[in-house]
Swiss-Prot record:
It is a peripheral membrane protein. SUPFAM superfamilies: AtpF-like (SSF159468). Keywords: ATP synthesis, Cell membrane, Hydrogen ion transport, Ion transport, Membrane, Transport. It comes from Methanothrix thermoacetophila (strain DSM 6194 / JCM 14653 / NBRC 101360 / PT). This is A-type ATP synthase subunit F. The lineage of its organism: Archaea, Methanobacteriati, Methanobacteriota, Stenosarchaea group, Methanomicrobia. The keyword Transport applies.
Length: 99
């Protein structure tokens, strides 16, 4: 199972330096949506990481699809704090790691 990252050049470079091989730059909304669809179709990807700002600019229908996805589990990181990551991990592995 691999981790994929989609985002701006800074995020892609950072995750690439951390050893993530599937790190894709997407600047426009169209590039972002196309790359997300490509990664979602890849059976080797178990986790997809996006920046919260990129996630927020996606169409609501795609946001819903990503939010409900178990494989890959989609994690939006950035400035917003939420319990969503806890719920996604619980849904993906069946265990609440915070208990």
């Amino acid at each position: 199972m691999e981790i994929a990252v989609i985002g701006n050049s800074d995020a892609v470079i950072g995750f690439s330096l951390a050893g993530i091989k599937k790190a894709y730059e997407a600047t426009s909304e169209e590039e972002l949506i196309n790359k997300i669809n490509e990664v979602m179709a890849d059976p080797n990807v178990g986790i997809l990481v996006l920046h919260q700002n990129d996630y927020n600019r996606l169409p609501k229908r795609l946001q819903s699809t990503l939010s409900n996805s178990v494989r890959p589990t989609v994690i939006a990181i950035g400035t917003e704090q939420s319990t969503e990551m806890r719920e996604k991990i619980k849904r993906a592995i069946g265990v609440d790691l915070w208990k």
